[in-house]
Amino acid sequence: MQNPVKSVAYEPEDLLTDRIETVIFTATTNCNLRCTYCGVSLPTYKGKDFDFSKIAGIAEQMANASVRAVQINGHGETTMLPGWANYCRQFLDRGIKVAITSNFSFLYSAEEVDVLSRMEWITVSIDTVDRELLKRVRRKVDLRTIIYNMQAIRLRAVSVYDHYPVFNWQCTLTDQVVDGLRDWVQMGILNGVEHFTLGNLIEHTELAEVLGKDGVTVPRHIAFLGKDELVAACHSIADARRLAYEGGGDMTIQPGIAEGVNARLAQLGINRMVDFSNPSTLP
């Protein structure tokens, strides 16, 4: 399913600034997981690691330029890189706030926990809290490891640094996990998660053939659901969003989800423009 959000054209002067607030830093496009919806699972995929030989100098330049924060990775898995904690420390030791996206599939060492506990924002890629389903969808990951890592980080943060990193749970929303969103939010709240993100699935059509040879059912965008299933999915999303806010957190629903749902509803003859923040718009 294609993301319906269109690109925005910028004039050159729009990019001029006297200060860079946040740097998006791609440490690697490699990943230790092979999620059943991700292009990394394709045999033709080739990732690449950043050359960290000059990382200290890069971090120093950022500090001198008054960069406030560095967002590390949004695609590959930083914590699979040897020495990743030291690379992150280069920014932290210079007063630059660090945010990271990780699948938390490794059991982290005390040194790694310490570095993570100093961060400002940690996004954990976790699509469901159903352990067996999580293994089927994301492969090579265990819910228990994720939860343990989170609590170890929170303990270190509050006991040594007198703060908590903000935890954001990110779910790539698919037909296989949408029914479990309520449990996903509840488990997150119980473990100190403050923010939840529903990610819009960008489908790779080749995956069905490649993974189908091994009997793997590839997740689909919820916009491909039938009428009854789609209506139920809409209510599941809205209920999870409400629960997140009632629990003191919030939820981001990425562009492409509502748009895909509304286009599908129109195909099914349901004249509704769903707004997940407004229950009266639900079918």
PLM regions: where:
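N-terminal [4Fe-4S]-dependent radical SAM core
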Residues: 1-24, 64, 250-282
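Conserved alpha-helical substructure of the radical SAM core
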Residues: 1-121, 132, 136-140, 144, ...
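A short helix->loop->beta-strand "cap" motif at the edges of active sites that frequently abuts
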Residues: 67, 95-96, 157-165, 248-249
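Active-site beta-loop-alpha junctions enriched in small/polar residues
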Residues: 75, 103-105, 127, 172-174, ...
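Short, well-ordered alpha-helical microsegments
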Residues: 81, 107-110, 177-181, 261-262
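Structural beta-sheet core signal
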Residues: 100, 124, 169-171
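Conserved strand-turn element in the central/C-terminal portion of the radical SAM core barrel
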Residues: 150-179, 223-226, 256-257
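Catalytic cores of alpha/beta
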Residues: 175-191
